[in-house]
Design a protein with these regions (language model features):
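Domain-level recognition of soluble alpha/beta enzyme cores
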Residues: 118-149, 153
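Structural motif
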Residues: 81-89
Length: 158
């Protein structure tokens, strides 16, 4: 069983955005990254697409939703500022029901999920934090993540 954790694609400068941050959209670069992520995961057997409520996260999953015919579900536990254990537990509950989830979240939540999983015994292959549009492929066995593989962003940004 797999869980795919995706950091949202490039959304431009937070400081240059003068509206509510959760409404900040993807940049043209981010749109390209989102398409590349979708191409990489289109045949990964994903059953559900989970997103933070933030627009940039939802937009990151739109090309994957189009490729798979799935709807993007907003999951509050993935919102920026949330903690790792509740997000990880929600993802593991879905995996326990046999669902493969691709979840898009933020640069604080994703590393917190990874840190929680490694504290619980998962082996991490790659960095603890990834750049925008980077992702982790998590292997689940016996109700826990056992292995986490970091996949760099599709445009090679580090």
């Amino acid at each position: 069983m797999k869980i795919h954790l995706i950091r949202h694609a490039h959304a431009g400068s937070r400081s240059a955005w003068d509206k509510a941050d959760h409404k900040r959209p993807l940049s043209p670069r981010g749109e390209g990254q989102a398409k590349a992520v979708a191409a990489a995961l289109a045949d990964a057997g994903i059953d559900e697409l989970w997103s933070s409520p933030s627009l940039r996260c939802r937009q990151t999953l739109v090309p994957l939703a189009e490729a798979t015919g799935l709807e993007v579900q907003v999951v509050d536990v993935l919102d920026e500022g949330n903690d790792g254990p509740p997000a990880l537990d929600a993802l593991l509950a879905a995996a326990a029901e046999g669902r493969v989830v691709a979840a898009c979240s933020h640069g604080d939540v994703i590393p917190a999920v990874v840190a929680t999983a490694t504290r619980r015994g998962a082996e991490l292959e790659g960095p603890r934090a990834i750049s925008k549009a980077g992702r982790y492929v998590c292997t689940v066995a016996d109700g826990q993540i056992t292995h986490i593989l970091a996949v760099p962003p599709p445009d090679g940004d580090t």
